[in-house]
């Protein structure tokens, strides 16, 4: 993709001959986040390797791999049996307790036991942050963030695209942070200016303000004066191939994700700065530099998707330069199979 100027002097993306020869599509970015077909639950290996985590009254709320169930039974058998009823015939893992606080206490004990004794690497990244599983718009159980993948729940976050638009040239530049080399996940990859998980009991906008100060050292007044809610993206994060995956390892986890998306238009004199050690640096990327980084897979996958969302909404990615435009836009808003926050 090459950035050129339109007859009105605006920046536009033009598809090149090289793009056509390589068959390039921004759909590749979607595939890195969610390659699952609509009928993924009908695949034989999915039916064999996946169990549904359910509420005490049978509402499905998560995907749990059989090997993860085996690990929990091995590491914390007593807590597991007190927490869940395992139905092998229906492939269901059902909470036993009808009480919110009791469920939270049990799942917290289970998570801590897994952290100390499990062989699963993901649970070692303890965050001391709870994610809520929502049913009927209310929190059903609170889960330590580090075991969200084990239980296959829907998680939520906020992602903000920060940009500067030159009033004369109309050229856009993006504030792009590079993740810290010490980050537990995706170290040194490119990110959105501000992003963070929706930890309980923080609200969505409350998280926007909290993360803005923590990650970019941006004051509340800057955010309130310049932020704009622009929608959401939703997907089932999965890195395998549904046709061959055996669902017998951590990289086979399926986690539903909802990202609430915001635009933050900043003036040239407002400069984000690393504040909490999670960001190495902030840099201004031109539109061409951003496109190049997307193509080179330098962005964290879901951050790349949020950037693509911006490029679609602002008219840079269009039906004229993206051969899979309709599929891309549709797949960025997957209808998730479990109850959601809103």
Swiss-Prot record:
Record-linked SUPFAM superfamilies: Nudix
PROSITE patterns in UniProt: NUDIX (PS51462)
InterPro entries hit by this protein: DUF4743, NUDIX_hydrolase-like_dom_sf, NUDIX_hydrolase_dom
CDD domains recorded: NUDIX_Tnr3_like (cd03676)
Domain Nudix hydrolase: 155-309
Pfam family for this entry, one: DUF4743
Gene Ontology molecular function terms on file: 8-oxo-dGDP phosphatase activity
Miscellaneous comment: Present with 217 molecules/cell in log phase SD medium.
Protein name per the record: Uncharacterized protein YJR142W
Lineage: Eukaryota, Fungi, Dikarya, Ascomycota, Saccharomycotina
């Amino acid at each position: 993709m090459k950035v050129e100027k339109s007859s009105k002097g605006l920046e536009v993306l033009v598809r090149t001959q090289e793009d056509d020869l390589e068959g390039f599509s921004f759909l590749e970015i979607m595939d890195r986040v969610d390659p699952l077909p609509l009928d993924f639950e009908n695949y034989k290996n999915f039916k064999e390797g996946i169990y549904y985590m359910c509420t005490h009254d049978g509402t499905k709320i998560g995907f749990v791999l059989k090997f993860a169930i085996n690990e929990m039974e091995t590491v914390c058998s007593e807590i597991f049996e007190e927490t869940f009823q395992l139905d092998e015939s229906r492939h269901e893992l059902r909470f036993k307790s009808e009480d919110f606080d009791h469920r939270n206490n049990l799942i917290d004990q289970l998570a801590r036991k897994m952290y100390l004794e499990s062989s699963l690497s993901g649970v070692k990244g303890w965050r001391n942050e709870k994610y809520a599983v929502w049913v009927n718009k209310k929190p059903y159980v609170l889960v330590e963030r580090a075991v969200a993948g084990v239980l296959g729940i829907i998680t939520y976050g906020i992602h903000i695209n920060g940009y500067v638009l030159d009033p004369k040239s109309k050229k856009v530049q993006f504030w792009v942070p590079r993740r810290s080399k010490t980050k537990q996940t995706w170290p040194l990859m490119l990110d959105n200016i501000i992003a963070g998980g929706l930890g309980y009991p923080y609200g969505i906008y409350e998280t926007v303000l909290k993360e803005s100060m923590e990650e970019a050292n941006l004051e509340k007044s800057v955010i309130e004066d310049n932020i704009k809610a622009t929608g959401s993206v939703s997907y089932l994060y999965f890195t395998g191939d549904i046709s061959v995956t055996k669902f017998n390892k951590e990289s086979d986890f399926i986690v539903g994700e909802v990202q609430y998306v915001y635009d933050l238009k900043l003036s040239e004199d407002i400069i984000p700065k690393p504040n909490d050690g999670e960001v190495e640096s902030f840099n201004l990327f031109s539109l061409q530099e951003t496109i190049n980084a997307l193509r080179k897979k330098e962005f964290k996958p879901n951050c790349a998707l949020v950037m693509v969302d911006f490029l679609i909404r602002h008219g840079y990615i269009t039906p004229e330069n993206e051969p899979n435009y309709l599929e891309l836009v549709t797949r960025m808003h997957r209808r998730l199979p479990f109850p959601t926050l809103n």
